[in-house]
Regions:
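Active-site-adjacent structural elements that line small-molecule/cofactor binding pockets in enzymes
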Residues: 1-343
Length: 343
């Protein structure tokens, strides 16, 4: 099991980078860099590649709609070269509020687009001349442009032709696609004991089509982490606020994928209540309405013995990357302890 964390997109990027340098020394294996409608993730990942030596750097995630497939592939190849083979491309659909509201492009056919983007990226990394006919047409047909486009291949030799692709997937079809085509899966808001119950059929269907060369599917899981008693209250508040944001406000009513995943884990009534409160502007009440047992099982907050039990539950669910959001006076020291527990 590897140890990973995610940088918050609203934080100062320079301070984020300094924290990663310290966490790398403490044993962190992988850092994910988010991109919502904040600073772009690519700039910080390039900076991290220069500041770090060992830690893997993942895009967590690059929205599939905001870049062309070939630009996504070029960006991944460039970051992988700068980091000397430490980059992982995380892809995700984001949601219509961000894609249409901030980027101004239609949010349509996310699963089909993800499949084509994965295919195009891998073709670019193999330095093939890109010819693709689907939702994306490359080169552009003459009737849609000047008629001067021709198939091209990447100029540079990539550091790797098999840059790992991870997908943030919550819907059944997208999870199935991920299990079929991606090296890794980035689920969210999951109680580990519920992972198979919610996503088992989709994972099995995708795995049945999976190429042997991809190896077993890697999966992240974990949550807010605290083991010191004086940190329990702020850690639980951080977790509740984050859960309320995603379950209640990260998407319009009826199009909130996080709300759906929460409901499918046995919390249908609570999902509706949290969303109603959050969308009504009662964010603190939404956070308080989250069931205690969900907060306990979807985080790593408690005495060392309890946290080690939760890590064991993550491992039993098939989690390969323990994903932590640490709350501590001395974060590197906390990560060093957890590093020992998972080895």
């Amino acid at each position: 099991m590897l140890l990973s964390t995610q940088l918050q997109y609203g934080d100062d990027p320079i301070r984020n980078a300094e924290s990663v340098v310290a966490m790398e020394r403490a044993g962190l294996d992988m850092v994910w860099v988010a991109e919502a409608y904040s600073f772009d993730a690519v700039s910080l990942m390039g900076y991290l590649a220069a500041r770090t030596e060992r830690v893997q750097i993942g895009a967590g995630i690059l929205p599939i709609y905001s870049r062309t497939p070939t630009l996504t592939a070029m960006t991944a190849a460039g970051l992988d070269a700068l980091s000397q083979g430490r980059f992982a491309l995380g892809l995700g659909a984001s949601g219509p509020q961000v894609i249409e509201g901030f980027h101004g492009v239609p949010y349509d056919r996310p699963v089909a687009r993800t499949r084509e983007i994965i295919e195009i990226c891998r073709s670019v990394w193999r330095r093939e001349k890109i010819e693709h006919d689907g939702l994306y047409t490359i080169p552009l047909p003459p009737e849609r442009g000047t008629g001067l486009g021709k198939p091209l291949k990447l100029i540079n030799q990539p550091h790797r032709a098999d840059i790992p692709i991870w997908v943030a997937a919550l819907g059944e079809k997208n999870v199935q696609l991920t299990a079929e085509l991606a090296q890794g899966w980035l689920p969210h808001l999951m109680v580990p004991e519920q992972l198979r119950a919610v996503f088992g059929p989709a994972l099995d269907a995708g795995t049945a089509k999976r190429a042997a060369g991809l190896g077993p599917l890697q999966i992240t899981g974990g949550g807010v982490l605290a083991v010191d008693e004086d940190m329990f209250a702020p850690a639980r508040k951080r977790a509740r606020d984050m859960f309320a944001l995603y379950i209640g406000g990260m998407g319009a009513r009826g199009r909130n994928f996080y709300n759906t995943v929460f409901a499918r884990q046995g919390y249908a009534a609570e999902a509706e209540l949290v969303q109603d409160l959050y969308l009504d502007g009662r964010k603190d009440e939404a956070a308080a309405a989250l069931p205690d047992d969900f907060v306990d099982r979807a985080t790593l907050i408690g005495p060392p013995g309890f946290v080690r039990e939760r890590i064991a539950a993550q491992r039993a669910a098939g989690i390969t990357h323990l994903h932590v959001n640490p709350v501590a006076e001395d974060v590197p020291r906390l990560l060093s302890r957890v590093r020992e527990w998972i080895e």
